Amino acid sequence: MINVAVLGYGTVGSGVVEVIEKNKDMVNKKSAQELEVKYILDLRDFPGDPYENKVIHDFNTILQDDSVTIICETMGGVGAAYQFTKQALELGKSVCTSNKELVAKHGPELLQIAREHNCNYLFEASVGGGIPIIRPLNYSLTAEKIEAVNGILNGTTNYILSKMEKEGADFDTVLKEAQDKGYAERNPEADVEGYDACRKIAILSSLMFGKNVDSEKVPTEGITKITAADFEYANAAEYTIKLLGRSRAIDDDTAEVMVAPFMLPKDHPLAMVYGVFNAVFVTGNMLGDSMYYGRGAGKLPTASA
C-alpha cells in the first residue's frame, strides 16, 4: 500500500484525486502496489464532496504519519508550499508538484534535499501541463547535447494570439472573452506579461544546461502590445506571431534565455499550435529537431502529469 497526501484541493488538487481514483486499477497494476489517497490538506471544508472525510487542516498530521510516503503539492505560491515541501523531503517523503513558481525559485535546493534524504522531488507537471517534457530532457535525451529549446508555454496567451490572428480582433476584446470562458484569470498579469512562461523556460533551461537559471534574470516581454495590425503585417509575409520561451546555447558556459513575442514562418511546427495547446521544440546535436505537444493546462492534463 502506497499512501498519498494531496496538498491543496483546488483545480489541480481535485484533479489529482480524480485521476488516482478513476485510473486506480491501471496505476496499481503498473506500480505493482495499491495507491491510496489518505489525506487532502486544505484550509477549507468540502461538505458533500465524495472525499470530504479525507480533508484535514493540519500539515503535521501528514508529517507525523509514517505510512504517507508520497505528497502531491498543488497549492501554488512559494510560502507554505516551500516550507511544507522542505519538511516533507527532510523526512524522506517524496514530493511531486505542479508549482512552477516554487520549482523556478527553489528547485535546486529542494532537489539537493531530496538526494540527501533518499527520496524524490518530481516536477513534470510544472511545465507544459500534461505534456511530458521534464523526463525527456532529464532521461530520454541524456546522450544529447541540447542546443536549443523553444516553447509555447502558456495556453492563455496562445489562445489570445490565435483568436487575434483568425478573427482580426484586438487584444482587450479577446482577453475579456478568454476570461469569460475561464481560459484567463481575472488578474491575467502573470500570463499576458510573460511571467508564467518565464518561470517555465527557466526550469527547462536549468535542465538543459545542468545549472540553475534564475527566472528573475530572464528578459521577459508579454503580448499586451501586440495589435491586429501586427498580425496583418505578419500574415502578408506568411508569418504568424507566437509568445515563445527561448533558450539557446551560445557555448558550454553561456546561454541566451528570453521570453517574447516572435514572428514564425507559417510552416514552422510551432506556428501550427493553436488555442490553449502548448508545444516544446527541442534541438539536439545528434537527434536534430523534436517536438512535444499537448494540452498545456487544465485540471486533468496537469493532474495526469
Task: Show which residues each predicted segment covers.
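Conserved anion/nucleotide-ligand pocket segment
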Residues: 139-193, 197-199, 204
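Rossmann-fold NAD(P)-binding glycine/threonine-rich loop
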Residues: 81-91, 100-138
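N-terminal glycine-/serine-/threonine-rich beta1-alpha1-beta2 phosphate-ribose binding loop
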Residues: 1-91
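ATP-dependent carboxylate/acyl-activation modules
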Residues: 1, 6, 269-305
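Structural motif
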Residues: 7, 73-75, 98, 105, ...
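A short hydrophobic/small-residue beta-strand
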Residues: 94-96
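Short glycine-rich anion-binding loops that position phosphate/pyrophosphate groups of nucleotides
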Residues: 76-78, 154, 264-265
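Substrate-binding/catalytic subdomain of NAD(P)-dependent oxidoreductase enzymes
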Residues: 175-272, 277-279
